[in-house]
Amino acid sequence: MMPISIVKALIQGQPPARRLFVPLIFTLAAKLEDVPLSNFVVNPTKIANSLAAIHQRLRLDGVTCYFDLFLVAETLGCQLNLSTSPPALERPTRETALKMLQQRGDVKQRGRLPVALEVVHRLRGTLRNSPALVIGLPGPLRIAQQLFGQDVLRELAAGDDDALDSFETLVEITLSVAQAFCLAGAHLLYFDELDVPVEFLPEWQETMVAVWKTVRFHGALPVLSIPRALQIETNSSTDAMHLPEELKGRFEDPANAPLLCLKPASGEQAPLSGMPFALALPVTGETFPDVSPWLRAKECALVTTDGEIPYQLEIQKLQQQVAAMRSLFEGT
């Protein structure tokens, strides 16, 4: 079954015919073109050509058209130094950040967003209906931290009105950007979010429903990666998957939910919930933990990576790294 058909089945709440294998590979492709990263990320031709070449070599279920957790902040006006590894964002003053949100204009036409959208257009034509087209974006809480610093998390947890207004604006921006990628032809949107403060969790989830529903409405699958706050726990006596109390009833409706990206500890027993999930493999280290119980679970619909495979990896080792990941679930 083709990857795009599997994504559509997941959107419709149907069990997938097989799991998808989509490690996130983007900036590493710059090494195929042998160009500086700062040149690569603004050149849709080089991006599309190198990603197509990687797909022809690795035959993955998805191609990561763009992955940049600073993309939205830069679009809003933040300065990004791409010559460092990893790239460094210069955080604006609070007053400047507020002005950025107030005078944002049409963010889809600013920064590198037009480049990223063009890559999706090109790969959709070049690769036809073979792999799923993937976009990696920051969650709105991550963008808030980039703009306002760590204090914004405490302010949101305390219910500060200014912080809440800024967060709602960032959710609107996230929704607009996500919709643009869906309309361009992306099939899977990977949202990399921060830990959500417990006190802010209900508000965060309620606000994010609009993003999940919009992405699904446009025929794409939202995938949510969060370090710990939404970690699903396993009850060893019942083998049941339990959400935190604050989220019960909120992620049970697939139409209002993302595909949760889980990062289990080695050897931990997989949840049996009837609810599909994605499994994130670590992107660093020579060996992988034993995640066979999770891979045997029929609910494991997607195997991906915990973020982007780093640019620092030697391009010659990419095929070896992907083969090691693939070997984990062959035969499961």
Cite the ranges covered by each PLM segment.
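N-terminal amphipathic alpha-helix/helix-capping segment at the start of soluble metabolic enzymes
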Residues: 1-28, 36, 117-129, 162-165
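Catalytic-face loop-and-helix region of soluble metabolic enzyme cores
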Residues: 6-12, 32, 216-332
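Catalytic domains of carbohydrate-active enzymes, especially glycoside hydrolases
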Residues: 46-68, 176-188, 238-242, 249
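Active-site mouth loops of central-metabolism enzymes
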Residues: 33-46, 152-176, 278-286
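Alpha/beta catalytic barrel-like cores
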Residues: 17-118
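Active-site-proximal, glycine-rich beta->alpha crossover segments in alpha/beta enzymes
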Residues: 81-180
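Active-site-proximal loop/short-helix segments
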Residues: 70-80, 134-156, 184-207
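Alpha-helix-loop-beta-strand connector modules within alpha/beta enzyme cores
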Residues: 89, 108-131, 200-224, 328
